[in-house]
Amino acid sequence: MAELISKEGNKVSFRVAVPAAEVNRAYDQVWAGLARDVRVPGFRPGKAPRKVLESRVGKGYVENEVRDRLLQVHYPQAARELKLSLVDARIEPEPLVSGQPFSFTVRGETYPEVTLGDWRAVQLTATAPEITDEVLNRTLSDLQERNATFQTVERPIEATDQVTIEELGEEGGSYPVYLDVAEPHVRDALIGKNVGDEVEITVPAHQHGDHEHPEHTVRVRVQSVQTKQLQPLDDEFARSLNFESLDRLRTDLRAELERRARQEGDAARREEFVNQLVEGMQVEIPQALIDRRREAMLEEIQDDLGRQGVKWSEYENFMREQGKLDEFLSDLAKNAESRVKRDLALEKLAEDLGVQLSDAEFSNTMNALAQANGLTPQQLQRQLGPNGINAYYISLTREKALQQALATLNGQQVAGRQEAGAEQTAQAAEQESGQPQAEGEQAAEQRGE
């Protein structure tokens, strides 16, 4: 039985009383497990008396196991009974005695109450970039550049040439330099030189990785000069790119640019809407919620570093030496708060809209996500695990609510709208989900959903 003691804002405390019969049942379950798992010389498995088992594992061990079992069952059950969604809790158990009732007190912070502003009155200003003839021609020029060839010439080096140089000295070697993207000090030193010339290049002081490099001079010899040859924009160029004609290339390229522009416009409108949704939200966020997200984000960073062979302690010391650790931790806390606010706003939006995800929608999107990552649906499910699947379900629900709200603002018919497709929905939800265990998932666990 659960009894609410106090509730002030997000702060709450309640007391839970567990009947003696439940306590005895928990003791019986723990003793049965010990009898099965603990081997006692002279006794067959499961036949050792409790006193003998207690002498092997200790009375304190048995009590801890029983207490943990009771708390795991009756704490979430009490939270559901009182309709509380706890973000953070401190449990204060009273003494545990076999054959007697067991009580404990819970003090913590509840999942916050969220109130959204009138999001239907939001005016979105973001638009898709216009694909003009100038944009199309610039993209065609980029295609020419990417498909350029180089021809060896006998003349002084010019600004757009590719130059092969040999670094003189014991550790020298030959390598190409593309002058149109080279550093200014390299470009200035080489322009006007000829094959066979020896050139001194002064390299400014700079930092590379963890190391500071002072200003120094490198001596090189010019081995060859090649000039860039651009193919003319004609049908032959188009056919080299597997298009039947230049007109077809221009038509298909414009269509692709317009598709990307629509995606860019949609992404900008999404971000603008979510930002305004968060700005109009009224909520008192428990610090524990932000702290938990910050810790999860830090663990993700540590995992990423580990995959690159870098220990977090080494990276932390490096940032401390550079005087950047405090800034890093401050930015991490700000990002954690921002993510929590987005999650709360989108979860409340889904609740207000009554958004539900059908089994077919979830299955289709999971299949699309698996395919996009080169996995079978079964492999993806094993990789995510139960918590990950539940968190992803919540992310998809948020995404569906976001799409529905945007469609409403656009004056579009929401029912049956399938423009985004399962794969795009999966990608968008994955970007919004942030961490494997989202705030909404943990609230759902407390609510018993």
UniProtKB/Swiss-Prot annotation:
Biased composition (Low complexity): 415-443
Region (Disordered) residue spans: 411-449
Gene Ontology CC: cytoplasm
Disulphide connectivity of cysteines: none
Protein location: Cytoplasm
EC main group: isomerase
Residue ranges occupied by any PPIase FKBP-type domain in the UniProt entry: 160-231
SUPFAM superfamilies: FKBP-like (SSF54534), Triger factor/SurA peptide-binding domain-like (SSF109998), Trigger factor ribosome-binding domain (SSF102735)
PANTHER family named in the record: TRIGGER FACTOR CHAPERONE AND PEPTIDYL-PROLYL CIS/TRANS ISOMERASE (PTHR30560), TRIGGER FACTOR-LIKE PROTEIN TIG, CHLOROPLASTIC (PTHR30560:SF3)
HAMAP family: Trigger_factor_Tig (MF_00303)
Functional description taken from the UniProt entry: Involved in protein export. Acts as a chaperone by maintaining the newly synthesized protein in an open conformation. Functions as a peptidyl-prolyl cis-trans isomerase.
Domain commentary: Consists of 3 domains; the N-terminus binds the ribosome, the middle domain has PPIase activity, while the C-terminus has intrinsic chaperone activity on its own.
Family recorded in the similarity comment: Belongs to the FKBP-type PPIase family. Tig subfamily.
Name of the protein in its database record: Trigger factor
Organism: Deinococcus geothermalis (strain DSM 11300 / CIP 105573 / AG-3a)
